[in-house]
Design a protein with these regions (language model features):
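Conserved small/polar residues in nucleotide/adenosyl-binding loops
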Residues: 379-386
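Short beta-strand segments of a lipoyl-like beta-sandwich/carrier module
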Residues: 15-17, 50, 59, 112-131, ...
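Interdomain "pre-motor" coupling segment immediately N-terminal to P-loop NTPase/helicase cores
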Residues: 66, 70-73, 86-91, 95, ...
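P-loop NTPase nucleotide-binding/switch module
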Residues: 98-120, 138, 149-150, 171-172, ...
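Conserved P-loop NTPase nucleotide-binding/switch module
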Residues: 239-255, 260-261, 265-266, 274-275, ...
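N-terminal accessory targeting/assembly segments
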Residues: 1-96, 101-104
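Nucleotide-state-sensitive switch-loop elements of NTP-binding domains
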Residues: 265-315, 350
Length: 387
C-alpha cells in the first residue's frame, strides 16, 4: 500500500487522489493534516475518489491521505442509550464539553466513554462453546435496558478464560475465546461493525404482530406490522416530523433510534427536550432511558447525511440481536436522497429523474430491506425504519 497518498483535487466534499493508492472500495480514510473522516467511493484506473464527512474548507492539494485498512464502522457497546451522536457516531455531548457548541475539524472523540466502568454479570464459564451472537455477559445500561454482550458474528470457539463479576471499562477483556485453529480471541464490552453491511440473522419470519403506535388513527386505518417498514409522505409543514415524534414517544418498541437526517436543529432540540420530560407509560422512567438520537442537522456537512442513516440502522440491528424490539425513525430519507444527489453531481454522474442518481432506488431498498421480524440465535425481534 502506498504511504505517500496525497490530495490531487477537491470539489466540495469530494476529494481525489491521482495514481496508485492501494486503497479499497468503501475503505475508511483520514484526509488532510487535520485527519478528516472520509470513505473511498470510487476506484478508477489512475484516480481514487473519496467522500469526506466533514467540512473541507481549508484543505489543499498535496496534503496527505491516511489509510485505515478497514470499512466505516460503528462502535457498539454500553453507553449508546441516552446518548446523542452525529452522523458518524461522534458523541455530541462529549464534544460540547471539550470543544464548545461547534464540532472542530478532525474531532476524534470516541463514540463511547472509555473511562466509565460498568457492573458486568458474567454468564459463561471456561469450557463453554460459543458462536456468533451468543451472550457471554450483561450489565444494566439504563434502569430499563439490560445490555447484553454478544460474541461478534463469524466467531466461534471454546471459552478458556472468564473474568469474575465486577466493574469493567468497555475496552477491558472479560472473556477469552479459542477457535478451532488454536487462536485466542479477546472479547471486551464493545465491538465494531461496518455500517453498510447488515448484521446477519438466522432467518426472517413473517410479519404477523401489529406495532402499536399509540396513535389510534394509524393503528385503526393504517396499521404497521412489527418488522415492517412504513413511509410518511407529504409536503412541507404537513406534520411528518411531528408524527414521527409521536411514534417515537408512544410506540410499543423496546428501543427507539431517532435519526435526524438533514432536519432543522430546532426540531432535534425539541425532541431532546420533550423526550426528557415524558415518562414511558410501560416503565414510568423517562423516555430517554430507551432512546438514541442521531443528529445530522441541515447545517452539518451534507455528505454525513448518508452515513447517519446507516449508523442508525446498525445501532438498531445491534439491539435487535440482543432480543429487543427496535424501532428506527429516519427523518427524513428525502433529505438523505438530496445528499446523494449533491454527491452524484460532484462526481459528474448521469442524472435520472429530478437530478437524482440512477442508483437511488437500489440505495433506498438496501436500507428498507434491513427491516424485518427475524430470528437470531435465541431471540425474535424487529427493526422498523420510518420516513
Amino acid at each position: 500500500m502506498s504511504e505517500n497518498n496525497v490530495i490531487y483535487g477537491i470539489n466540495g466534499p469530494v476529494v481525489t487522489i491521482k495514481g496508485e493508492t492501494g486503497l479499497s472500495m468503501m475503505e475508511m480514510v483520514y484526509v488532510g493534516e487535520k485527519r478528516l473522516v472520509g470513505e473511498v467511493i470510487r476506484l478508477d484506473k489512475d484516480l481514487t475518489t473519496i467522500q469526506v464527512y466533514e467540512e473541507t474548507t481549508g484543505l489543499k492539494p498535496g496534503e496527505p491521505v491516511y489509510a485505515t485498512g478497514g470499512a466505516m464502522f460503528a462502535t457498539l457497546g454500553p453507553g449508546i442509550i441516552r446518548n446523542i451522536f452525529d452522523g458518524i457516531e461522534r458523541p455530541l455531548s462529549a464534544i460540547a464539553e471539550h470543544n464548545g457548541a461547534f464540532i472542530s475539524k478532525g474531532c476524534a472523540e470516541s463514540a463511547l466513554d472509555e473511562e466509565r466502568e460498568w457492573q458486568v454479570n458474567m454468564l459463561v464459564k471456561p469450557g463453554d462453546k460459543l458462536k456468533g451472537g451468543d451472550i457471554y455477559g450483561e450489565c444494566p445500561e439504563t434502569p430499563v435496558v439490560k445490555h447484553k454482550f454478544m460474541v461478534p458474528p463469524g466467531l466461534e470457539g471454546e471459552v478458556v478464560d472468564v473474568k469474575p463479576d465486577g466493574k469493567y471499562k468497555i475496552n477491558d477483556t472479560i472473556v477469552t475465546l479459542r477457535d478451532k485453529k488454536g487462536k485466542d480471541h479477546e472479547l471486551t464490552l464493545c465491538q465494531r461493525w461496518p455500517i453498510r453491511i447488515p448484521r446477519p440473522v438466522n432467518r426472517r419470519l413473517p410479519a404477523q404482530r401489529p406495532l402499536i403506535t399509540g396513535q389510534r388513527v394509524i393503528d385503526t386505518l393504517f396499521p404497521i406490522a412489527k418488522g415492517g417498514a412504513a413511509a410518511i409522505p407529504g409536503g412541507f409543514g404537513t406534520g411528518k416530523t411531528m408524527t414521527q415524534h409521536q411514534l417515537a414517544k408512544w410506540c410499543d418498541a423496546d428501543i427507539i433510534i431517532y435519526v435526524g437526517c438533514g432536519e432543522r436543529g430546532n426540531e432535534m432540540t425539541q425532541a431532546l427536550k420533550e423526550f426528557g420530560e415524558i415518562s414511558d407509560p410501560r416503565t414510568g422512567k423517562p423516555l430517554t432511558d430507551r432512546t438514541v438520537l442521531i443528529a445530522n442537522t441541515s447545517n452539518m456537512p451534507v455528505a454525513a447525511r448518508e452515513a447517519s442513516i446507516y449508523t442508525g440502522i446498525t445501532l438498531a440491528e445491534y439491539y435487535r440481536d440482543m432480543g429487543y424490539h427496535t424501532a428506527i425513525m429516519a427523518d427524513s430519507t428525502s433529505r438523505w436522497a438530496e445528499a446523494l444527489r449533491e454527491i452524484s453531481g460532484r462526481l459528474e454522474e448521469m442524472p435520472a429523474d429530478e437530478g437524482f442518481p440512477a442508483y437511488l432506488p437500489s440505495r433506498l431498498s438496501e436500507f428498507y430491506e434491513r427491516a424485518g421480524y427475524v430470528k437470531t440465535v435465541s431471540y425474535t425481534h424487529l427493526t422498523l425504519p420510518t420516513n
